[in-house]
Design a protein with these regions (language model features):
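Charged, compositionally biased interaction regions
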Residues: 1-184
Length: 184
């Protein structure tokens, strides 16, 4: 959680200084090994990273999926990424969300997903886990063609994760964090 001070006179809030700080994090010592950076600013100073679910909800409710996700691919910064094409050719992602609330997050699995006979569980507001055994990535994409914007804007689903066991992932926040962010 940082301060956003580059353009305090603008009425529209968007990440600016936040991105500078995220790049600083990715370029500093052991921090450069980070695979995911979730970063935001809180003008009220009420938000805390010690309250992980609240922090995620804050970011997910403000996230502009078209502008706030920044990928670094084939970067030499990441020597611990074994999914790359070679040594020191990994990837990272910065999710930098700031500004006014853009959506209310889903607090139940949306009916449109249940109607598709998905084995899905609500992990936390805005995050749904889907059983990988019942839907391949391609099948999931085909089933949801044309529904992505509605799931996001009307239903408040920001993140869907395919997993072997959606109920396990949803049973504890640490299960979600471990499976989603340390195994990719």
């Amino acid at each position: 959680i940082v301060s956003e001070r580059y353009t305090p006179y603008l009425t529209t809030k968007h990440p600016a200084e936040i991105l500078t700080i995220a790049n600083h994090i990715l370029g500093t010592g052991q921090l450069s090994l980070a695979k995911f950076v979730f970063i935001t600013a809180d003008d009220t100073n009420q938000l805390s990273t010690h309250h992980v679910q609240e922090y995620f909800e804050y970011i997910l409710s403000r996230l502009d999926l078209g502008n706030d996700i920044h990928f670094y691919t084939k970067t030499t910064m990441d020597t611990l990424d074994y999914s790359g094409e070679g040594l020191n050719a990994g990837s990272k992602v910065v999710i930098a969300a700031y500004g006014d609330v853009k959506r209310n997050l889903a607090t139940t699995v949306p009916t449109r997903l249940l109607d598709l006979n998905m084995d899905a569980s609500l992990v936390m507001p805005g995050v749904i886990a889907v059983n990988a055994a019942t839907y391949t990535t391609a099948a999931l994409q085909n089933a949801l063609i044309g529904q992505g914007e509605a799931l996001l804007e009307q239903e408040g689903v920001v993140m869907m994760i395919r997993t072997e066991d959606p109920k396990w992932m949803a049973s504890a926040l640490n299960n979600f964090l471990s499976a989603a962010f340390t195994r990719t």
